Amino acid sequence: MLIKHNIVALLAFSFMASATAAEFSIGAGAVYNESPYRGYNDNVHAVPLVSYESESFYFRQTTLGYILSKSESNEFSITASYMPLEFDPGDNDDHAMKKLDKRDATAMAGAAWYHHERWGSVKVSAAADVLDNSNGWVGEVSLFRPMPMGKLTLTPSIGVLYYDENFNEYYYGISGNESRRSGLSSYSPGDSWT
């Protein structure tokens, strides 16, 4: 498979509303995605941005969390999230890629730790595929800093993502059977950092 770099640009405009010690925000964004799969068209999607924060639960992007421990500077939670990565050979324009197996989106479960300081926040998380599509897991270490600007909040971040070998094999590998059907070379990726 020809693997391209994912480019995601997110422009978010949100507002905050408070209700009994919980915070809810809603907004709209745009996501540009250059597909990692050859034969897919680049696309832009409008996406709703919904966030909910309470003392015990949160919903951030595609992740639901239950907070086990929280202090002024630390938060530890268990998480469940949606991993939207998928491949549908029927939607592909490339003849060889149409002969590969379908890869499904999945659900992930894991844990996250946030450490908050005045200069920003650090996130460390890990999650595993609970639907056994890939039997893989992913990890993240990132630094972010919300920057309120009136009713708009911009949150720049930088980080490192880890994908284990099973995750990469499922989403990006080409098995021997797929190679024979498609004429593409078999491919077995290892783990990766991005």
What are these regions (language model features)?
Residues 28-32, 48-54, 66-68, 111-115, ...:
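Residues on the lipid-exposed face of transmembrane beta-strands in outer-membrane beta-barrel proteins
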Residues 34-36, 95-99, 126-130, 181-190:
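Extracellular loop and loop/strand-boundary signature of outer-membrane beta-barrel proteins
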Residues 26-28, 50, 61, 76-80, ...:
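Membrane-embedded beta-strand positions of outer-membrane beta-barrel proteins
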Residues 1-25, 39:
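Cleavable N-terminal export/targeting peptides
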Residues 36-42, 70, 103-105, 127-138:
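Solvent-exposed loop/turn segments connecting transmembrane beta-strands
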Residues 30-36, 54-56, 80-86, 117-119, ...:
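Transmembrane beta-strands of outer-membrane beta-barrel pores
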Residues 130-194:
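Outer-membrane beta-barrel transmembrane domain signature
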Residues 22-26, 44-46, 55-57, 72-76, ...:
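Outer-envelope beta-barrel architecture signal
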